[in-house]
Every structure is written in C-alpha cells, then in structure tokens.
A protein has these predicted regions:
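Alpha-helical transmembrane segments and their immediate interhelical/interface regions
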Residues: 18-31, 90-115, 213-222, 324-339, ...
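Membrane-interface interhelical loops and short amphipathic "cap" helices
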Residues: 14-26, 87-98, 150-168, 223, ...
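Interfacial juxtamembrane loops and adjacent helix segments
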Residues: 150-166, 174, 369-416
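Aromatic-rich transmembrane-lumenal/periplasmic boundary elements in polytopic membrane proteins
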Residues: 100-101, 141-154, 342-386
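Alpha-helical transmembrane segments of multi-pass inner-membrane proteins
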Residues: 1-4, 8-9, 32-47, 77, ...
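Transmembrane helical bundles and short interhelical boundary loops of multi-pass, membrane-embedded
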Residues: 10-29, 251-357, 362, 465-468, ...
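Membrane-interface catalytic loops of GT-C/OST-like multi-pass glycosylation enzymes that act
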Residues: 20-24, 94-99, 172-173, 217-224, ...
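Hydrophobic alpha-helical transmembrane segments in multi-pass integral membrane proteins
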Residues: 21-82, 292
Length: 495
C-alpha cells in the first residue's frame, strides 16, 4: 500500500506516450509483491493452525467476518470473468488496452487487493503519511507544470496538447479523478491529526490543491470535490467543533483563488495559466471569495459562541447539529432533483463537452444488445465496439474516436460492458460504504475522511470513466473502509 500511494502516481517511462501501461505495470509489480507476502503469511498461519488443530475454528471465524461489501466485490469479479469469457474480444477485455487499462485482469487483481487490505490493515495512521508524500509530490509537479515550467520535459514532443496533459498523471481527466478523492480526504484528515506541525502541512497541501483547480483545464475536479464537499459540510454540521476546519478550508480556497486571479490577469509565467469554464466564472466574477467570506463568518460566530452564556451556546449547538444538518440533507436532495431535471430538459449530443453523445451512443448500444449482453454485458473494456457500431449506424461524424472508448460515466460504463448485474454491483459499491458509516456508533474522522474520498470518486465518476490509477486508489479506500468497519465490530463485540 505504501508503494502504491507513493510511487504509483509518479512513475512514468516515456513521457505521456506510455503512461497508462506504466501505471499498470507498476501496479502488477506491487500487487505481486503483496500477494507473495500474504501467501507466505497464510502458509505459515495454516501450518500453525493445523498443528494446533484449530482449522475449523479459524475457518468459522473468517467466515463470520464476511460483510456485504465482500460479497459484492466477489460477485463483481466473477461477473467480469464470465462477461469476458463470452465476449467478442477476450484479449482486449482482459487487458483493458482500449479502455484506460481497466480490464478484467485489473478488476480481479484489484478485488484480491481489496480483500487483503480489508483483512490486514490495522488502522495505523502511518499509512496516510505516505499518501500525503506521494500526493504532495505529484501536486507540486502539476502546479509547476501548469505555470509553464516543464522541468521534466514531459511535453517536449506534444506542445500543441500541453493543456490536456499534466504532472506524472497523464490526461487532465485522470488528474481530476485523482484529486477528487484526495482533496476531500485531506479536508477531513486534519480532524484526526494531533500534531500541529502536521496540520500546517495538510493545510498547505490543500491551499496548493485549491490553486491547482483554478489553473487546470478541466471542470471535472470541481464536480468530484464539490460533491464530496456536500458530505463534508454535513459531517461538519453534525458537530460544531468541526466547523472551524470547514471555515479554514473556505478561507484557503479564497486565498488560492486570489493568487490564481492575479496570475490570470497579470501573466508573468512562461505560459499563461489555463482556465476552464468554471474557473473562468469564479475568477471573472470573484465568486471564489464566497467560501472565504463564509469561513470568516463561521469563525466569528464560533468566537462569539465561546464568550456567550452556556445556555445560549447549548441552544446554538443544538440548532446547528440537529436542525441545520437535517436541513442540509434536504437541500442536497432538492439539488439532485434539480440537476436531473436540468439534464433531462437540456439534453443534447454536445452537452458537457460532447459527453451527451457518448452517453447517448453507449445507452443505445445497451438497448440494441442481446438479452445476454443486457444481463452480462459485452465484456469489460469493450465499450468502443458498441459505441463505434452506434456511431456508424447513426452516420454521426466523430473527430476523436478515442473519446468513445469509455462511457465517461462509471455506472453507464459497467451497464454496457457488464450488463445489469455488473451495474447493480457497482451501484452497491457506492451505497454499502454509506451503510457501514451510518450504522457505526463511533463516527470517527478517519472513517469520514475515507468516505469523503469515496464520495469524491462517485462525483468524478459521473463524467469520467475508470482509469487505472484512480481505480486502484478507489479500491484501496474501499478496503480501508471495510477494515475500519471490521475493527469497529470487533471493538463492539468485546464491549
């Protein structure tokens, strides 16, 4: 896990030309090391249990630890194998070569990694230090890159596409998926970090991360981080002590926006910064200041609350934690309904940078499929065979065929490639972590931070497809979430 968090995001061999295969190869290497270590440990454990004649007892203990998410993950892997076995192109379905390297091999391997992490992670916070180190390094390279200092000479042979490749990650959509998980995680990581020095560096990382939002040519990061922030706001409202951290994040966002606006209006770097539509809207109308103003208001109210009589403070805390938090849930529900109606009434093939056409051809391909394909899909990573057939059928002009290799929507991707059963499993992967969190008596910040990362993945998954690095991190967070749930159950059983 340490190697995956630190080295996997940074490794590349031939600039951006082979970066997907690079990430895949390194993941295979780290996975094999992990599998070998676990296999040896299991063999030693098995020998000891046989000697002590405790095989059946240990088997019962392990079976009792199986949870709903374990079952979903196992079924998902089995469905991927079956779908590939009956697909028209087994080789590409296995490798995922045509779909950002997330094929059946990756799915099965990641499920094994999930089971290892969910059983072996002990809850030690040292893991997050390595996550911070790897992410901070990649983020620093990305910011320097966006300002026009290509010190790694990554863009040397593709100057015309400078703005759509970044850092050691690759395409800006991959970058968006990566940060959509890690920014929300570190927004809450401060709450379980005791060392003030460490808190300072987390806030410094967040300042840099917010700055990167403004200067990168992608809106997807705003979507992923924004949706995760909805959960973070609710979590903060449930305990007024957490509001200070939320306020600081709002102020940091405003500061980052101010720096970005200065560089945007006064270009002084080798290359003018890139701004997508959301960044341009925030900078032109100074809307980035709103979170900062709200943060200052929250801090002032917290200071006033500290000097108020205890009776008034208790009433104010009750209002925030029991009434305002519930009102926020209702606001989210109204927002979801509004977003659905907006998409329905404004749907066209050019919607969201031609994602409308990708979604349309993907869904029509699903509808035109056989009963088997509707239930089990055409095979993981084979979406392009469906979309290209639909494009030819509609006689639709496509300038960039590679855009249609993935559905740019996680659920739709698996609906077409793994059928209704695969999409149902994927949907359950989204829902079960919320159930795990809700049923827990101790809603620790660590668990909330991991859930925030998973929500960020769901958010970015509305507009991007599965990408190997993002997918690996998502699986790791799922495994950690299951491990926290397992430890909480064990603690409750002892009590």
């Amino acid at each position: 896990m340490v190697l995956m968090f630190t080295l996997l995001p940074m490794y590349y061999s031939d600039n951006y030309y082979n970066i997907l295969n690079d990430k895949r190869d390194v993941f295979w290497l780290f996975s094999r090391i992990l599998f070998a270590v676990i296999a040896v440990s299991l063999c030693v454990s098995l020998i000891l249990t046989i000697r002590k004649r405790e095989c059946l007892k240990n088997m019962r203990v392990q079976l009792s630890k199986i949870c709903a998410l374990d079952v979903v993950m196992l079924i998902f892997a089995i469905l991927a194998v079956i779908s590939t076995a009956y697909s028209a192109d087994i080789g590409n379905s296995l490798s995922g070569e045509n779909a950002w390297d997330v094929g059946t091999q990756m799915i099965v391997c990641s499920v094994i990694v999930y089971f290892i992490i969910s059983r072996c992670y002990s809850g030690k916070g040292d893991l997050w230090v390595y996550l911070y180190a790897g992410t901070a390094a990649v983020l620093t390279i990305g910011i320097i890159d966006r300002l026009g200092y290509d010190f790694l000479v990554m863009h040397d042979e593709i100057p015309l596409q400078y703005n759509i490749f970044i850092s050691t990650i690759g395409n800006v959509n991959f970058w968006a998926g990566y940060l959509s998980m890690l920014i929300p995680f570190f927004m809450l990581a401060v709450l379980f970090t005791k060392n003030r020095f460490a808190k300072f560096f987390i806030y410094l990382f967040l300042l840099a991360a917010y700055f990167s939002l403004f200067i990168t040519l992608t809106n997807t990061t705003y979507i992923g981080v924004g949706i995760a922030t909805l959960f973070i706001v609710w979590y903060s409202l449930c305990d007024v002590k957490r509001l200070k951290n939320l306020a600081v994040n709002g102020i940091l966002f405003a500061i980052a926006g101010g720096i970005a606006e200065f560089l945007w209006r006064n270009p002084c770097t080798p290359r003018p910064i890139d701004t997508d539509s959301v960044s341009r809207l925030l900078l032109e109308h100074h809307l980035y200041l709103l979170p900062g103003i709200l943060g200052i208001v929250i801090l002032v109210l917290l200071l006033l609350g500290a000097v108020c009589p205890e009776k008034i403070r208790t009433k104010a805390d009750y209002f925030v934690e029991h009434m305002l938090s519930k009102f926020w849930i209702w606001l989210i529900m109204v927002g979801i309904i509004g977003a659905v109606f907006y998409i329905i009434y404004n749907y066209n093939l050019e919607l969201f940078n031609f994602r409308g056409s990708i979604w349309y051809f993907s869904f029509m391909g699903f509808c035109d499929g056989t009963l088997w394909q509707k239930l089990m899909g055409v095979g993981p990573a084979l979406l392009d065979t469906v979309t290209q057939a639909q494009i030819a059928k509609a006689d639709f002009f496509v300038e960039w065929n590679w855009l249609y290799c993935t559905a740019h929507n996680d659920l739709l991707e698996y609906l077409v490639t793994m059928g209704v059963f695969g999409a149902a499993c994927k949907f359950l992967m989204y829902i079960v972590p919320f159930v795990m969190y809700a049923r827990g008596k101790e809603r620790k910040p660590e668990k909330a931070a991991v859930l925030a990362a998973l929500v960020g993945y769901i958010g970015q998954g509305l507009f991007t497809g599965p990408y190997i690095l993002t997918y690996v991190f998502y699986i790791i967070f799922l495994g950690v979430m299951c491990a926290y749930d397992r430890m909480e159950k064990a603690k409750g059983a002892k009590a």
